[in-house]
């Protein structure tokens, strides 16, 4: 039985998807309108980014609604193979639905990078362990540092970036010298759902790197296809929604979100004396003024009042 089938007891299905495909402005506006109307009618929530290079998004709703949404999106894009990963949860993972037109669906900040024309070689989830253990390979985690800290593949390089825009500078300063000294190394990259590492491979190819690979479907596809017994994944996978993190079974993990700084906080962080619910965590204890914390405290008070009036399990725990 597939992991996805065993989780159908949960009310909500989450779809994380992307597709690098050329879209003209008129089509972007049409797609945005169609998807917004569909999301409203089907009570789907989430975030969709549309740009001339494609579409990127994560949505949450009932299974039938999600199936209809993905089918509609594929029809609008005139494709039949959009890259999509599924997971389940007992509560709505988003507060609202947003569809936005952007310059890029994942921002690297370089106009000349075009993943619709050139990307690296895909590595299937079932073949990823072999690549990780290959002494002639170097593996790079293209996610942000705060994501990597809560879960990663051991031995992967951490560029220690706070945004994807910083990745090219890291490549020039660190990766390029490494490959110049070790030209036979194969390069493998991974990210949450496949989009960042796919665009990263496009950048490396543009910069003249060869033998560039990336994990198809990202960490989410790996966790879906590879059993925990055979897995080389450590920790939890950060996701950009109310669940904050997922465990190896693709269920909501143990992390929460600090409402002050927006970083994930672990159960251990919640026990630290620096942690104050809604006001600060250990990572941001020195980042805000008393005026900021007064605003945070009022916001937390309002959140607590709202939660008292809502049915149990209708909203994620506040931190």
From Swiss-Prot:
List, in alphabetical order, the GO biological process terms annotated in this UniProt record.
tRNA modification
Ranges for domain Rhodanese come to 133-231
* Active-site residues, as the UniProt record annotates them: 191
Q: Which superkingdom does the taxonomy of this entry point to?
A: Bacteria
User: Could you tell me the keywords of this UniProt record?
Assistant: Oxidoreductase, tRNA processing
Report the function annotation for this chain.
Catalyzes oxygen-dependent 5-hydroxyuridine (ho5U) modification at position 34 in tRNAs.
NCBIfam families, alphabetically?
PRK00142.1-4
What name appears for this protein in its UniProt entry?
Answer: tRNA uridine(34) hydroxylase
Q: Which organism is it from?
A: Prochlorococcus marinus (strain NATL1A)
Query: Lineage of this protein's species?
Result: Bacteria, Bacillati, Cyanobacteriota, Cyanophyceae, Synechococcales
Q: Which gene encodes it?
A: trhO
